[in-house]
Amino acid sequence: MTDTAADSANLPDTGQFFQRGNYAPVPDELTEYDLPVKGAIPAELDGWYLRNGPNPRQPTGHWFLGDGMLHGVRIEGGAAKWYRNRWVRTDSFDTPFGVYNGDGSRNLRSAVANTHIVNHAGKTLALVESSLPYEVTKDLETVGCYDFGGKLNDAMTAHPKICPTTGELHFFGYGNLFSPHVSYHRVDAAGELTISRPIDVEALTMMHDFAMTSGHVIFLDLPIVFNIDIAVSGSGDMPFRWEDEYGARLGVLRRDDPFGEVRWFDIDPCYIFHVANAYDDGETIVLQAVRYAELWRKDGGFGDSAVLWNWRIDLRTGTVTEHQLDDRAVEFPRIDDRLAGLPARYAVSVGDASLVRYDLRTGDAVEHRFGTPDAPGGPGEAVFIPSPSGAPDESNGWYMAYVYDPVDNASELVILDAADFAGEPVARVQLPRRVPYGFHGNWISS
């Protein structure tokens, strides 16, 4: 296998996993045109594939805390026009300043903006849950901090939900040291922030994601709780730890009564980084997510694995039933975004050197594997791109993901036919450098 050190940032080695292999940051920004392709890019694809992730310029104490870097490929006319990577130049990029002030208030412009990139109402936003979003162009240049015309006074989750029916953007913020620790917000299809309200929870917990249905939003109040001792220790680690006594619960708010009561439902203790989907089934809410039985009890590491899980919230009886859907360790679940909050049939997650496509209706699953047993490939999160022609079906389109090849120390943008998920990729765009493992991305159609 090829050594990654030659194209990695020259940072002091502190022994953390995210300094090595394809987790290691790249040292600079590139732009390359007319990328070579193996196979044939579908002519219908016209847009930008953009993905966010950490790429620290200085040593950090945790993978989640590196400076955000966007990696993008422009696809048009059956060709890969360009690849480029750019750091998100936040207000704290050149002159770092802390998230919290001495009095406990927050600097919402202090950001690494390293987690997700979404497009809504003509704005492309780089997101991290500790700050305001940062607007970027589709060419990956940073425009600046974006606060919805001065209306947003809280951080914005990196996992907002766009309603496919109304075009509204739903999101929450968290991070206040003092109550209220959580807030809920809604932006209309034109990009105007129309609703902001507090959500009462007992403590500052790490609420990374939430869920949306056609009639509800669901908050995840789980036992990863802010730890002030870690925060002031100077370790640079994530200042959250598992607390048994906190418990776990799901909070349900009706979308047609956004300032109404949040109903809380106790569940078995667990942690959820990422929701696959949720939907209404009569007087029951179905929630599908990747579940950790326990996380961060001793440190902020990733020794525990997660599996796909199902919860059914009965709004009539106030009870929740739950069960495991599969025993494979997976993360980063995605669905066809046209079905967000509706009964989607398929969810695709990152597995062990594979992408796993779950049939949520039948319980079946199919894998697309990368590399060989001796040199397994490394796929990232897969995004579904629906075909602009033909039936609006979850199998009529393509999945895109960056995939790392450890033999050549190189990355490709792989395009899979959704109707032949386990088959050969329809196209593999050869990238001019490896793309470090990161977090989330999106396809933005032209």
Predicted feature locations:
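Beta-propeller domains
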Residues: M1-S446
